């Protein structure tokens, strides 16, 4: 009625990962602990999309508290890959990736702490962006690791990803880590003359599936055909990324998840003897196995006897990883890497081998640690 043009995303069906607060709508983090939690406010990203007329169809499944890479640890059951129902969609934003791949929505919001947007996007054949840390407000995101978490979109293609990311970005007074950053814009030209594409050698070593290697190099040669120059770069510090990441992320998780104690909100057992028993029972029954595993790992790393030996060393590795990326970007404008060592694997393949699942994050966690 005002005569103004509607936003390009107005009326477009979308979905929201179930750890992003939605006023009046359950936000469970796929956990028994928050099975009946209903926020009284919207996350900033939800407010922004609501203001431009986006249509939210619902919340998407995920690994419990975003701790996983397969969306198999959800209290509400697994999500299957829409291309092959016997395989995982990736995680932890597997529900968002699957919803977009199945064309149930045009885009969905996810979160990425160590690859949780990029890996499921790869497994489901969609486009995922982890925005630079601080470019998108985290207000209303139920935290896993606050220094690493970032909200971003999963979409059908790159142009949609740019449009949604632009709508989400901007400084927010409710998030002190947020900043004003230039919104992404895809050029109309198809030539890439002058663009230097870095190929980090450390990302193409042992453990990378040959099919994945071939497809990434196919993409590299396509970029080269459009005028880009391929440049070999290296990041030897990458081999320390996984242990450092899991020390830091789990340490932050052990602190962030300490708020779920059965007293203020969340799961509360029907019977308990005293306050200590309430804490013990609420957390034992409210958290799943993987969440408890990571809380214990984080608490161990922060304990007085191991703080310097593990946590402080992991912080030093984090700083070295950032320097490694800085060195790469002196030679290249962008880096081309795999998102995961393999394609989507069968459901249950890593159920009894959490270390193997952790190693699947090798190509993604370093970006979060560098704040890129």
Where are these regions (language model features)?
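Short, well-ordered beta-strand elements within core beta-sheets of diverse protein domains
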Residues: 15, 33-38, 149-156, 298-304
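Short, solvent-exposed turn/loop segments enriched in Gly/Ser/Thr/Pro and often Arg
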Residues: 60-68, 237-241, 340
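Glycine/threonine-rich beta-strand-loop-alpha-helix active-site module
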Residues: 71, 111-139
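A short helix-breaking turn/cap at a secondary-structure junction
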Residues: 127-219, 275-281
């Amino acid at each position: 009625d005002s005569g103004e043009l509607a936003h390009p995303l107005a009326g477009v069906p979308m979905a929201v990962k179930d750890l992003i607060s939605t006023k009046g709508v359950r936000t469970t983090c796929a956990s028994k602990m928050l099975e009946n939690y209903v926020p009284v406010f919207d996350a900033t990203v939800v407010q922004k999309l609501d203001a431009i007329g986006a249509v939210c169809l619902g919340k998407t499944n995920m690994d419990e508290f975003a701790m996983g890479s397969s969306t198999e640890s959800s209290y509400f059951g697994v999500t299957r890959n829409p291309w092959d129902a016997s395989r995982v969609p990736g995680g932890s934003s597997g529900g968002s990736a699957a919803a977009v791949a199945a064309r149930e929505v045009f885009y969905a919001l996810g979160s990425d702490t160590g690859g949780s947007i990029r890996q499921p996007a790869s497994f489901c054949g969609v486009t995922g962006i982890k925005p630079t840390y601080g470019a998108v407000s985290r207000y209303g995101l139920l935290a896993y690791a606050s220094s690493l978490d970032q909200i971003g979109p999963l979409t059908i293609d790159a142009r949609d990803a740019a449009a949604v990311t632009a709508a989400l970005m901007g400084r927010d007074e409710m998030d002190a880590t947020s900043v004003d950053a230039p919104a992404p814009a895809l050029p109309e030209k198809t030539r890439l003359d002058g663009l230097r594409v870095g190929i980090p050698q450390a990302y193409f070593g042992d453990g990378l599936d040959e099919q994945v290697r071939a497809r990434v190099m196919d993409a590299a040669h396509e970029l080269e055909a459009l005028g880009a120059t391929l440049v070999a770069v290296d990041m030897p510090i990458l081999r320390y990324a996984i242990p450092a990441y899991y020390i830091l992320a789990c340490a932050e998780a052990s602190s962030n998840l300490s708020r779920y104690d059965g007293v203020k909100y969340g799961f509360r057992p029907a019977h308990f003897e005293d306050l200590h028993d309430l804490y013990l029972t609420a957390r034992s029954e409210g958290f799943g196995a993987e969440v408890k595993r990571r809380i214990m790992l984080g608490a161990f790393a922060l304990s007085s006897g191991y703080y310097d030996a593990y946590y402080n060393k992991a912080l030093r590795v984090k700083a070295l990883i950032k320097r490694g990326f800085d060195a790469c970007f002196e030679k290249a404008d962008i880096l081309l890497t795999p998102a995961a060592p393999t394609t989507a694997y069968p459901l249950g393949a890593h159920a009894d081998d959490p270390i193997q699942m952790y190693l699947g994050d090798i190509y993604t966690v370093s970006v979060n640690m560098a704040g890129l």
